Amino acid sequence: MSEHSDVVVVGGGVIGACVTQALAARGAAVTLLERESEVCPTASAVYANCGLLVPSEVEPLAHPGALGQGLRWLLDGSSPFYVKPRASLDLARWLWLFRGACAPEVARSHAPLLHELSEVSAALHDELAAVGGGPSIGGGRGHADAGRGTGDGIGGEGGGAGWRFHRNGWLFVYETAAGLAAAEAAADQTRALGVRVEVLSATEVRERAPQVRAASVVGGVLTPDDGHMDPAAFTRAMVARAQRDGAAIVTGAEVYGFETGGGATGAGVRALRTTRGVFAADQVVIAAGAWSPRLLRELGLRLPIEPAKGYSIDVARPDGTPDLPLCVGEAHVVLTPLGETLRLGSTLELAGWDMRLRQKRLAGLRRAAARVVGVPDEGPVRQVWRGPRPLTPDGLPVIGRSPRHANMVLATGHCMLGLSLGPVTGRLAAEVCAGETPSIDITALAADRFGV
């Protein structure tokens, strides 16, 4: 054996980084394995996503309205949620489970749990930023940041700099009466869980964000407690903090096999075989995002997680663009200001591991930004990105012990909420590894809910 740790964490994205940080902060001897040459690699779901911290997102992806809307979108290549037709038993299983999760009684039972996870994680984000990280610009929950600031994501944690996040809300704008009416109905349900939501008229939208230029905007919804940050900077800062607390970070370590059974772990995982050697551990955490099912199949687990391709485009941020994230509601296009960059992002595309860039998708992002806030739909692009979000059928993550391996903990399947739920996932995974009762009841997040 080349290495032995209390815990080995597989995956150097935001979830793996947060789990490693939480374990190292507790004094565990933890090793993080990342298959690429650096943590938070460009292929990861967090590298260039929209950087949203959204405690307001309490409605899971699978909800009653999603089924009807999804059926209209599924085979439309330009829709926000597209399923590429293909012969796949895994996809068929995922769609069947998604259908069941959209049942009203199921969705209603999931929303309070997602709200609790989001609220606790938002508080942990504040705590992490207060101790050696970047400031929460805007003065904390419920305060607006009126200025452009000095930019998000300023390096690692050297010199007390760290990342920055802005807690100044998220503004949705709608261009149709039907879109606004649906948003108002959703706002009522969200308020019932204690989330602050404001419905705005077209005039109020322009008062809050004068940069919104489209005459077609009929109104909007503001979630004032949401925020944004550079997701890659945050992830790397968590890894740097874990290293400072003694964690070992091993890159270029692709896991290709497991050694199981025997020893102190019983019917568990004794070691992981990787391209950088063999790593033994008392416990293993799988936090590999969309790659998790591939790893777990080696152990007989078939998690229904689909790699949902998302896109983003970085352009130079024009003067006068909004200081808070904006979502063009009907198009589901998000515009996030990140310092001198404006990131345009959207879409869920279930195309298996086909990660090709589709020009139609990219053009749709630019058209929406041009129409609503006047961002030129042609011109220089700083970066074009796509990456796989780990999408579960019910929109909830998988957190808890493996149903088949006593010393393996799963922390994956966060869909589009990895950045938001990273800190709470780190805490919960660390509690499970320590044999403690989790501080939040995560029974509903167990992998065996999918019959694995």
Residue ranges and their predicted role:
Residues 49-52, 57, 61-102, 257-260, ...:
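Active-site substrate-recognition segment that forms the wall
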Residues 5-32:
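N-terminal Rossmann-like FAD-binding beta1-loop-alpha1 element of flavoenzymes
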Residues 5, 199, 396-398, 402-452:
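C-terminal lid/capping helical subdomain adjacent to the catalytic/cofactor pocket in oxidative enzymes
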Residues 200-204, 208-209, 251-270:
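A conserved short coil-to-beta-strand element within the FAD-binding core of flavoproteins
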Residues 25-47:
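Glycine-rich FAD pyrophosphate-binding loop
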Residues 92-240:
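Rossmann-like flavin
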